[in-house]
């Protein structure tokens, strides 16, 4: 467990090779037994391999999981990597298999849509969203996921109706997605109201807070964005620490606080010396 936690910390700090080593050591300690914890470590190892640039290694790790239990998540994640390698045929095949193993999982349909959309296959991606909407909603989470799908399809009225059902059933996370809908509708006051409800719940993770901060950046509310980014960095687990720190520096820069932006960038460069874009940005800040 110590190696697993160390590996997670390494991912958060951008030390991906060290993370892979830590996860491998954790697996070596399992002495042949494979349970839920070992599979969890394998997923982390594959993520670290991909982030380190070892794409083929990540594919091998996901394949090992698939060989063991044909897990739909492993098929989906391997499919995403195939798309990153420009092998859409293998990617689509994995997506199809993932759904055959788990065809009532809304998040799987959403993930497939987002991947296809990212690689210029938006129309094909929408077909998956349409398939998901044919499922029958049974739980508050189902209504929330349907709300997300309607939002992606631009049907904001239907999104609000679905999300309201989830909120009525006390699903706190639905407030976050409701905030996103109003953000897209251009109603910043309503958006902020729902984001605040979610923030006050204490359930927001670092990815949610980063997205809320980015939404404020898009509206030119840089001070509010900085607050969201700071809240994210104060959490116990921050897997996307590098991205949040970088976004916060940009927010300081856009707000006109170049001194703080420069100071934060100096700290960032010590933590992430291999970021060439940041090095160029630092040169710019030195001229301000």
For the regions a language model picked out, list residue spans one by one.
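Start-of-helix register in tetratricopeptide repeats
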Residues: 1, 35-40, 73, 107, ...
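Canonical tetratricopeptide repeat
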Residues: 5, 37-40, 44, 51, ...
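Register position in tetratricopeptide repeats
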Residues: 12, 51, 84-85, 118-119, ...
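Structural marker of alpha-solenoid helical repeat scaffolds
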Residues: 29, 33, 67-68, 101, ...
